[in-house]
Design a protein with these regions (language model features):
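Short alpha-helical catalytic segment bearing the HExxH-like zincin motif
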Residues: 96-104
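Active-site rim/adjacent substrate-binding subdomains
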Residues: 1-96, 108, 115-117
Length: 121
């Protein structure tokens, strides 16, 4: 899938989210990259054999003070080639993009991995 098509898939997935979630994402940059960089993998302690589809970088809403303004916009990175490498069809890519985006957006809202696993994400 070319980058333009993949980015459109990401945008459409975000549009399908409930409005109350979308409005809170206004200061969150959603960035598509091919793969996580080696520097990012090292910083996160991710072994080379592990696959990373997405990453939330920022301060979760639950950890922010009332008067605290973010220094930089939060970011959600979506790794296109990593997702495509693991999927066998465009339908699987679409489903994995949805799962990954919801997972990373949940981190923005303050949910941790254990909770997300418990609810199926």
């Amino acid at each position: 899938m070319d980058r333009k098509t993949f980015e459109a898939l990401v945008r459409n997935t975000i549009r399908e989210l409930p409005r109350e979630f979308r409005t809170k994402l206004k200061n969150v940059a959603i960035i598509v990259e091919d793969y996580p960089s080696q520097e990012l993998r090292q910083r996160m302690g991710i072994p080379p054999e592990d696959t990373l589809f997405g990453l939330y970088e920022g301060v979760p809403l639950t950890d922010r003070g009332f008067f605290e303004a973010p220094v930089q916009p939060d970011r959600i990175l979506i790794f296109q080639k990593a997702i495509e490498d693991e999927c066998d069809s465009p339908e699987e890519v679409k489903e994995e993009v949805k799962i990954t985006l919801v997972h990373e957006i949940a981190h923005f809202f303050g949910m941790d991995d254990d909770y997300l696993i418990d609810i199926g994400y």
